[in-house]
Amino acid sequence: MSKAWKLKLLLLLQLLLLSQHDVDSASVISYLPGFEGLLPFHLETGYIGVGEGEKVQLFYYFIKSENNPEEDPLIIWLTGGPACTALSALAFEIGPLTFKTEGYNGGLPSLVSTSYSWTKVASIIFLDQPVGTGYSYSTTPLSYKPSDTGEAKQTYEFLQKWLVENPQFVSNPIYVGGDSYAGIVVPAIVQQISIGNEHGYKPQINLKGYILGNPSTDLDSDHNSKIPYAHRMGLISDELYESLKRTCQGNYVKVDPTNTKCLKLMEDYGKCVSRINEGLILIALCDLASPNPYSGEHGGRSYLQTLVQSDLSLPTPDCYMYRYLLASHWANDEDVRRELHVVKGSIGKWMRCNWDLPYEKDIKSSVPYHRNNSIIGDYRSLVYSSDHDMMVPYIGTEAWIKSLNYSITDDWRPWFVNNQVIGYTRTYANNMTFATIKGGGHTAEYKPEESFMMFQRWISGRPL
């Protein structure tokens, strides 16, 4: 081979390497369609390949702390579902942007800044996980079903590779966080990281703890706690509650079909709560369709979300689901996808929650993971519940925490903001803090200021 050809070949290889680097590297986003002017924070988006042959490409949004990103904690955050996009957390719950619902008259929805973003004091990776969620995709048809344990392994692999690409964050305190169904997966991710660190896998992850909001823990137990919760909140009578307890023996999920008395009482219970918004029992249900989209017969939240995604029955601006419609319009816009550097043709229609994704719920309870994590590592944990959330009632969360038999170091007491009671808290010897948010719903979006104050105090090591 001539010297000239060797030089050409070398140049070609260099170009290929540079091209590959451009594909793998994150993109810094300074402008977003719908937001006026420069973004007032540092946003990156990108993909990281995981699994066999890196066929699974996980999409993420990364926002640097607006305070001191060199030293502030780094959080990897998972949305619930399963298969609800990270954009939900970023735009509706704990991020620095949200959709403007007032005055929308068609076209691309507008984005506005929020006042209580958790990125004011921490850097956050918002991850579209599992594959098939948000903008995450697979380069080939999957030969397996995404699952809880699979998601835990892939999230650990993602974090390792992200830190290799961003070594400046390796020494930052790292936390894993999530809400709703992520309560099943986050403790398993913590265990994966712990095992990896123990085996000396590189990079070592400077894991300090985890954060769970209104977390699912054991789906049957979570559901069973709705009956006593409904009684505590005055949604069912004393007589009905006592009859349910006695006749159904505390099992309201898998009712024996021969127990006709229990089935009849469950019907009576359904009549009492069928028009209650489980996400926040204080607000009205959206009358998008009949029968009630929150009834178990139609899959609850997933049925309501399907209506929004199908455009068959659109919510009005006063409906809490209206912003989800705006998110769908925005995330499916070609200009938006181009600015976010979404791989063209990688997914079809973007959905806030992909309820049709085949998914194996192979972790029946995350309680054993909590136990293991308290033994493996000296981790801090924050578990918070809003007292008006009926999707995952706080009394079920209190029950599984109690089952861990941790000793109490700071007993039940109110916590305050501006001398007002915001909720109640209790701290345990294993560095677990439990907190309630008074008047809140299923996610932080219903009480953004209070949720931020709780997070800010806890992440800085101060008592609530």
UniProtKB/Swiss-Prot annotation:
InterPro entries recorded: AB_hydrolase_fold (IPR029058), Peptidase_S10 (IPR001563)
Glycosylation sites: N372, N405, N431
Predominant localisation class: secreted
Tissues of expression: Expressed in roots.
EC number: 3.4.16.-
Gene3D superfamilies to which the protein is assigned, alphabetical: 3.40.50.12670, alpha/beta hydrolase (3.40.50.1820)
Keywords associated with the record: Carboxypeptidase, Disulfide bond, Glycoprotein, Hydrolase, Protease, Secreted, Signal
Name of this protein: Serine carboxypeptidase-like 18
Organism of this sequence: Arabidopsis thaliana
